[in-house]
Curated annotation (Swiss-Prot):
<comment type="pathway">
    <text>Carbohydrate degradation; glycolysis; pyruvate from D-glyceraldehyde 3-phosphate: step 3/5.</text>
</comment>
<feature type="binding site">
    <location>
        <position position="457"/>
    </location>
    <ligand>
        <name>Mn(2+) 1</name>
    </ligand>
</feature>
<feature type="binding site">
    <location>
        <begin position="258"/>
        <end position="261"/>
    </location>
    <ligand>
        <name>substrate</name>
    </ligand>
</feature>
<comment type="similarity">
    <text>Belongs to the BPG-independent phosphoglycerate mutase family.</text>
</comment>
<feature type="binding site">
    <location>
        <position position="194"/>
    </location>
    <ligand>
        <name>substrate</name>
    </ligand>
</feature>
<feature type="binding site">
    <location>
        <position position="15"/>
    </location>
    <ligand>
        <name>Mn(2+) 2</name>
    </ligand>
</feature>
<feature type="binding site">
    <location>
        <position position="65"/>
    </location>
    <ligand>
        <name>Mn(2+) 2</name>
    </ligand>
</feature>
<protein>
    <recommendedName>
        <fullName>2,3-bisphosphoglycerate-independent phosphoglycerate mutase</fullName>
        <ecNumber>5.4.2.12</ecNumber>
    </recommendedName>
</protein>
<dbReference type="GO" id="GO:0006007">
    <property type="term" value="P:glucose catabolic process"/>
</dbReference>
<comment type="function">
    <text>Catalyzes the interconversion of 2-phosphoglycerate and 3-phosphoglycerate.</text>
</comment>
<feature type="binding site">
    <location>
        <position position="402"/>
    </location>
    <ligand>
        <name>Mn(2+) 1</name>
    </ligand>
</feature>
<dbReference type="InterPro" id="IPR006124">
    <property type="entry name" value="Metalloenzyme"/>
</dbReference>
<dbReference type="Pfam" id="PF01676">
    <property type="entry name" value="Metalloenzyme"/>
</dbReference>
<feature type="binding site">
    <location>
        <begin position="156"/>
        <end position="157"/>
    </location>
    <ligand>
        <name>substrate</name>
    </ligand>
</feature>
<dbReference type="GO" id="GO:0006096">
    <property type="term" value="P:glycolytic process"/>
</dbReference>
<dbReference type="InterPro" id="IPR036646">
    <property type="entry name" value="PGAM_B_sf"/>
</dbReference>
<feature type="active site" description="Phosphoserine intermediate">
    <location>
        <position position="65"/>
    </location>
</feature>
Length: 532
């Protein structure tokens, strides 16, 4: 006997689609979004929090894609690495960290160099400059003879020219403590690529590993000259400032805590099977990463991963149900690795499909990105009728929003809106439920108070829309479904479990966003017409 098709819950994550009533610099308000507008008018909706303590970050700290997907998938507020490491720096326990102490001992015994590599930024998304200061203090206490800093500039999670401020802070700390020197400078566009654009990574790798005469200017002077040429922090050309190449026998600490944009450079430096570009492996090389970038890398890890049990994907799998994940390259790790609590391997019954992102320098040149192809893949999965949960990420609002180009971001938003229309038609035909939300804000705030481009994330809430192909009915409440107004990202997984009529495990401490506890799916419903 043929099984009846499964009516899925489809979770659509509009990456970087925040909510803000201010119209100035708001690409979402400026865009024509008839699909989202009609859904917001016709279906239960609310706003949820995606920043600060609501997602395990310090109060006032903007959220990001890693944190967002981690909280969504875990169904609980997950203490973030930023907080863990900052606490270790503040209370001094970083000085006792076994992996960090060991690498210092190895460097000292060989009388070699210690290299500190990472994003010099106050953004708090991939790193924090205070963590670098903590490492300098550690190196001084460990009496390391030579400390070389390979500084990566931000301009994406911070203002485009905040690099001067960050590098000035760093140089002042070096001068005050008397340890360390900045030996290379590189924009994150090169050193932190995550899309296998190995030509970019190679440029950063080469300046870090090939010694030679340095530039006779200071790091700040180099940045100021770069700005004068229209090249801001993110895109600063890799440059050697002073002697101090990474050589055999040295030690390296990569102090970024977010894995996705740290993985490729680390692979180039340590992997014996690396083939992204031609290079001579540096060996022996002691190497510590702040967090686990990839379980297959031959490195020590300073802050081991937290083990999260009974997360959404695991619960779905444990009940014998199938699930599907898709996104384009830029956000694929988020709907897989991060959504699964930092696990690389899929759960039983979990299928995935990666859609390649377009090969362009920046996504304002291709604001549609691969949204149409992602939609095609998702529709095909829904039409199979075997998946109880389908998770989709649309990267456009975030990735194009990061360019600071408002017109291109408007195009990106409108592209996603059209794709949503097609997607929803397939969910309705399947008798499923669609949840439309976001992981953090971005595209709704693209100009700062001074009218300058804002390319970072925001602390704004994001929309949450519950869309049934047929109107939701709750016993005793008819079609009057209400959603809580105090929700956060960790409440999404419990909501999905309630819709699927699956028990919520005790480890999952989020609360369903449905105000009523006796929500049930009914076979007989009154169709609602939305302008699709």
């Amino acid at each position: 006997m043929t099984k009846a098709p499964v009516a899925p819950v489809v979770l659509v994550i509009l990456d970087g689609w925040g909510y803000c009533e201010e119209k100035r610099g708001n690409a979402i308000v400026a865009a024509k979004t008839p699909i989202v507008d009609s859904l917001w008018a016709a279906y239960p909706h609310t706003l949820i929090r995606t920043s600060g303590k609501a997602v395990g970050l310090p109060e006032g700290q903007m959220g990001n894609s890693e944190v967002g997907h981690l909280n969504i998938g875990a169904g609980r507020v997950v203490p973030q690495e930023l907080v863990r490491i900052s606490d270790a720096v503040e209370d001094g326990s970083i000085a006792l960290n076994p992996a960090l102490v060991k690498i210092c001992q190895e460097v000292r015994s060989r009388n070699s160099k210690l290299h500190l590599v990472g994003l010099c930024s106050e953004g708090g998304v991939h790193s924090h400059i205070t963590h670098l200061f903590g490492l300098l203090d550690l190196a001084k206490n460990q009496q390391i003879p030579e400390v070389c800093i390979h500084a990566i500039t931000d301009g994406r999670d911070t203002a485009p020219t905040d690099g001067v401020r960050a590098i000035t802070m760093l140089q002042n700390y070096i001068d005050r403590t008397g340890i360390g020197r900045i030996v290379t400078l590189s924009g994150r566009y090169y050193a932190m690529d995550r899309d296998h654009r190995w030509d970019r990574v190679k440029r950063a790798y080469d300046v870090m590993t090939q010694d030679g005469v340095g530039d006779n200017r200071t790091a700040v002077e180099i940045l100021q000259a770069s700005y004068a040429e229209g090249v801001k922090d993110e895109f600063v050309n890799p440059i050697r400032i002073a002697p101090g190449a990474i050589e055999p026998g040295d030690g390296v600490i990569f102090f970024n805590f977010r894995p996705d944009r740290s993985r490729q450079l680390t692979q180039a430096l340590v992997s014996p099977t690396f083939n992204g570009f031609e290079r001579q492996q540096i060996t022996p090389l002691s190497f510590v990463t702040f967090t686990q970038y990839d379980s297959d890398l031959p490195v020590a890890v300073a802050f081991e991963p937290q083990n999260l049990s009974n997360i959404l994907g695991e619960v779905i799998a444990n009940h014998g149900l199938n699930q599907f994940r898709t996104a384009e390259t830029e956000k694929y790790a988020h709907v897989t690795y991060f959504f699964n609590g930092g696990l690389e391997e899929p759960f039983a019954g979990e299928d995935r499909e990666l859609v390649s992102s377009p090969m362009v320098a920046t996504y304002d040149h291709a604001p549609a990105m691969s949204a149409v192809a992602v939609t095609d893949v998702a529709i095909a999965a829904i039409q199979k009728g075997t998946y109880s949960l389908v998770v989709i990420n649309y990267a456009n609002p975030d990735m194009v929003g990061h360019t600071g180009q408002i017109d291109a971001t408007i195009t990106a938003i409108e592209t996603v809106d059209r794709c949503l229309g097609r997607l929803l038609e397939s969910v309705i035909k399947a008798g499923g439920t669609t949840i439309i939300t976001a992981d953090h804000g971005n595209a709704e705030y693209m100009l700062d108070d001074g009218g300058n481009p804002w390319t970072a994330h925001t602390t704004n809430p994001v929309p949450f829309i519950l869309v049934e192909g047929e109107k939701v009915k709750i016993p005793g409440y008819g079609t009057n479904v209400e959603l809580r107004s105090d929700g956060k990202l960790s409440d999404i997984a419990p909501t999905i479990l309630e819709i699927l009529q699956l028990p919520q495990p005790p480890e999952m401490t989020g609360r369903s966003l449905l105000k009523t506890a006796d929500y049930e799916l009914q076979r007989t419903r009154t169709p609602v017409q939305v302008g699709l």
